[in-house]
Amino acid sequence: MVRKHRISQNFLRSPRIALMLIGHSNIRKRDFTLDIGAGSGVFTYALSKKSAQVLAIEFDRETFKKLQNNTKKLENVEVLCVDFLRFNLSKLPKNYKVCANIPFHLSSPIIQKLTVAQNSPKSIYLILQKQFTRKLIVSDKNFTSALGVKTFPFFESKIKKPLQKSDFTPPPAVETVFFEMKRRETPLISKEEQPIFNDFIEKMFAVPEFYKKNCQPKFKTKKPSELKGEEWLEIWRFWQNSDKIE
């Protein structure tokens, strides 16, 4: 397979590595899987062997032609040349799963899109920068990002496997991991509350005075990035029952 290097995207060297990673997922032969930023199709090919149906999305037209050529004999694979951030996820079957090696610079918007969608995936598996994933895991043991807090009520996140630089071409300059986000069977807040919750979290991280005015005194000595998930839920419920100070 011919591969083209693009900014902040490092491609897996072979389908063998992709198959090994899929082995660390909960993807099964009955599943519909989505490959985002499919490149020339290394992950797509591996997914075609491990799931019932694969939709591979690639935005770069030159790379898409290679993807088409490399997957034309795979009967359970459909390929689309579209911008994933504009793609309508409601077109996909319920409980689809995502497994992809995405461009690192698009990690946040891609995760945001997947996790706020009405038809969100049952499981998400992404190759990501290790430092970025640490901020997605809500814990008082590491600094958490606003995105990590926003996804916490709806998805359980963890690092599944560290990767070697030699797994990629070109080798990345940063440490990378295979990251899992599993949709909670019962979300910790309702899906209907998600837009308001997300706006609230964004403001709590961005505006220090808003944070200090809208959380309990016991949390004011901590930064937003230092709180545990359970503490954020407590703050959220406190704010819902308060006068909502701006």
For the regions a protein language model found, what residue spans apply to each?
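Catalytic cores of RNA-modifying enzymes
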Residues: 1-199, 203, 230-246
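Short helix/strand-capping connector loops at secondary-structure junctions
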Residues: 1-2, 213-222
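Flavin-binding catalytic cores
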Residues: 199-215
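Catalytic core of IPPT-family isopentenyl/dimethylallyl transferases
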Residues: 221-231
